């Protein structure tokens, strides 16, 4: 409609409570187009509860879950089996659960990772979430065999029943795109671990460039272990992961720099070229710092 000589007043209202645009969305599809993979205010900060360690791999079948369980056994033996602090072990491999099967000999689990995601999607307060779920998680005790005997830890399975797995209400990805919840998952896991008196939280993530894994991978407060075999495709894929995970990350002792576990190393195999290639993947996008930090960034694990 043409009204000659008339003008329309336009006013803008700014909500001071709105989430800042500088808060990066921790998903691969977003990080790809950013200079940094991380929300700068979180770099070099700690989680509010106990440390969270995430085990990830580009490919399946390279020993990621076995590496996590080896960590559990080593922790148990160093901490006097039943007398030490328990670990909270979470099966976050939503598309191919593995650790969940440790709980399948028992009755239906009282609680699951998918339950945790649903409650976190619905509630805004991390303290309220923890109060709702802590008692149920404490019921999830599982005995794990070690060389020195049985150790008891808390294992949070992916799901309670198959239908829950096939028809998900919430996922790590849906949390990452929710208002003010981009980095809530790591905070909930950390505070949950503290509430149930766990020493650490260990998370077995979905393999690949999966948005189900991205929210924890791109939270700079989470310690990451990337597991790769010596195969060509596994090493190349791990290099892609490292390039994305190192974007904007200072290479210094205050950063939780992703570490690599090189598995299935045959006796007598020369891995120097593989290790050099993996270390080189950190540098194009990272903020360079102390190069000595990178000396032990790759750990070789023999084939057994």
Q: Which ranges hold each PLM region?
A:
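C-terminal lobe/tail of nucleotide-utilizing enzymes
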Residues: 1-44, 247-304
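Phosphate/oxyanion-binding active-site loops and adjacent basic polyanion-contact surfaces
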Residues: 24, 29-32, 63-67, 177-185, ...
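Walker A/P-loop phosphate-binding motif and the immediately C-terminal alpha-helix
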Residues: 38-97, 101
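Conserved beta-strand scaffold positions in the cores of enzyme catalytic domains, especially
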Residues: 50-52, 89, 153-155, 224, ...
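Short secondary-structure boundary/capping segments
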Residues: 70-72, 102-113, 117, 171-173, ...
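Conserved catalytic-core segment of NTP-binding enzymes
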Residues: 85-86, 182-291
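P-loop/Walker-type NTP enzyme "switch/lid" segment
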Residues: 94-194
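Short loop/turn segments at strand-loop or loop-helix junctions that form parts
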Residues: 155-161, 229, 301-304
